[in-house]
């Protein structure tokens, strides 16, 4: 039994390291848009054998694509790696004091659907929750009509966020938002995993990934 437990623990550690490597590669591929194996390995200081192992698993899982860039060069042409847009999609809700926005983006980050709506000040938490979840539904419905597999829901919320619980703790400009368990509410309502973070951090991450800050 002890030997079996040790094998399981080692297996879990190996699996955890692989997931970390895949996340690291995927993040770098997102920031690059499209990048060859050689450059990727050099940037991340990863051995060729390790890189090939991780990349192949990501291709097999449908996370990334590998395709010829079509340029004419001597010798073997580079084969860029890029996120696979058909792997699935994410529904995103972004709101603040006076407005809210819902988007659907594919796995490569391309916007497939977007809607804006006014959000009026309110003191009733149940009413606020109903408005927010109803707007999330618009994104869910749009994704389903597109035939896209929904991987999860992201919420960019204003104010103080408890990232551990996904709770909006406090926001000065929406009284009804105090101690709203956004992650729990969204997951129970949609049946999809949800991540909640402060909207300013989300904007900064987007700029770091796709904007001028990536350089």
PLM regions: where:
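Extreme N-terminal segment that seeds HTH/winged-HTH DNA-binding domains in transcriptional regulators
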Residues: 1-42
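Basic amphipathic alpha-helical segments that dock to polyanions
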Residues: 29, 40, 51-64
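Short helix-capping/turn signature of helix-turn-helix
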Residues: 31-32, 108, 174, 210
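Short beta-strand(s) of the beta-wing in winged-helix/HTH DNA-binding folds
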Residues: 36, 65-66, 71, 162
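Conserved phosphate-binding catalytic cores of ATP/NTP-utilizing and phosphoryl-transfer enzymes
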Residues: 66-90, 194-215
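Gly/Thr-rich phosphate-binding beta-strand-loop-beta motif of the actin/hexokinase/Hsp70
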Residues: 77-114
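Glycine-rich phosphate-binding loop and adjoining helix at the ATP-binding site
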Residues: 116-215
């Amino acid at each position: 039994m002890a030997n079996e437990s040790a094998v399981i623990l080692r297996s879990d550690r190996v699996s955890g390291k692989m997931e970390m490597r895949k996340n690291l590669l995927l993040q770098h591929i997102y920031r690059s848009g499209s990048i060859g194996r050689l450059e990727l390995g050099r940037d991340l200081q990863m051995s060729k054998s390790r890189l090939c192992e991780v990349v192949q698993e990501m291709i097999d899982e449908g996370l990334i694509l590998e395709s010829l860039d079509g340029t004419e060069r001597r010798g073997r042409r580079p084969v860029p790696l890029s996120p696979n847009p058909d792997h699935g999609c994410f529904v995103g809700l972004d709101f603040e004091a006076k407005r809210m926005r819902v988007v659907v983006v594919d796995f490569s980050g391309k916007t497939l659907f977007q809607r804006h709506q006014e959000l009026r000040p309110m003191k009733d938490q149940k009413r606020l929750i109903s408005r927010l979840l109803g707007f999330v539904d618009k994104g869910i419905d749009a994704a389903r009509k597109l035939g896209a597999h929904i991987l999860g829901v992201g919420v960019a919320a204003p104010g103080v966020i408890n990232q551990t619980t996904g709770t909006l703790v406090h926001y000065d400009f929406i009284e009804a938002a105090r101690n709203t368990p956004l992650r729990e509410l969204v997951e129970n309502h949609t049946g999809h995993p949800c991540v909640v973070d402060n909207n300013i951090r989300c904007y900064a991450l987007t700029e770091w990934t796709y904007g001028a800050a990536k350089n």
